[in-house]
Amino acid sequence: MRPATSEEYEKMMVSLDGHLASLGLGPAQRPLNAALVVSATLGLSGTPILGGSSDRGENFSPKDLLARVHDWYEETYGDRTKIDFSPGSVVISLHGNLWEIKMPKVWGSFRMFISPDLSNTGNHIATRGAPPVQHNILCSVQGMTPAYAKRLSKDEMLLLAGNFINGYEAVMCLDDLKGHSFFDEARVDYRHSVDALLTGHELSKARWDTAQCAEKVLKGLLGRDGHAYPTSGRKGHDIEHLGDLVKEHLGIDLPTADLAVVHCSPAVRYGQERSTTEQALAAHEALVRLLHLLAQARVHHTHWPDP
């Protein structure tokens, strides 16, 4: 029965939200699914389920009911309903602080620019006849304030721009890799490594997860092409050795210095070897450079099916 009062609507939404939670859906996944369930259950076929229109009609009319679904989730869960479409982030050091540069999710091409005016975010939606999508790089730096942005020198803005450009290609390469189950694991390791590095006190975890990401990317590339790779013993986790195999079998020459910096011994993982911020950041930067080189080799521009 269609609710006709706020009390009836609240009771319906609490019950529906509990049902969706029991199915394992997180807060960000529930608004659209809730709107679909309400539409199907109450026979509201043909009514837009996304809301957003200012013309909602009468209270508890079909359009108003579905708009209330989104209102209810926004009021109840707030930012937890927001979906983060970013493919990933890179970390840089500036003025002694670690900063996260979160990459935007872009469908198609876009133009990058950098401006200390953070209100100038760019044009994020391109329509026919309109300028192409544009993005202010400083708006990707998490926690950047207008006051801090205005203090940046020209060289510092160029540093940020360079890290964004190379980091974007690296992150998109990792995000687009297909054809081996290791790639999904590598993406998780990468996110964990960035999160750990940004905390400032999980540095051993950051280094280990960085090495795990590199190891699984390299093994995934080898395995995808049918080449053998070590699975146990010292060479099973030897990043430099895996780099040699990638060069031998795939013709991609990865810098030995970067492979060595990314490599991490089990002693780090188990807390037997102390890690510093400098070591963890150096490993992260080396991994980003390796992923950038793999992007230039176009290892992600294939039509491999998901495993």
What are these regions (language model features)?
Residues 2-181, 222-307:
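Long, charged low-complexity segments
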Residues 176-193:
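Short, contiguous, well-structured surface segments enriched in hydrophobic/aromatic residues
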Residues 182, 206-210, 257:
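Amphipathic alpha-helix face/heptad-repeat signature
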Residues 184, 191, 211-212, 288, ...:
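Generic structural signal for well-ordered, non-transmembrane alpha-helical segments
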Residues 187, 193-194, 201-225:
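Short, hydrophobic, well-ordered secondary-structure elements
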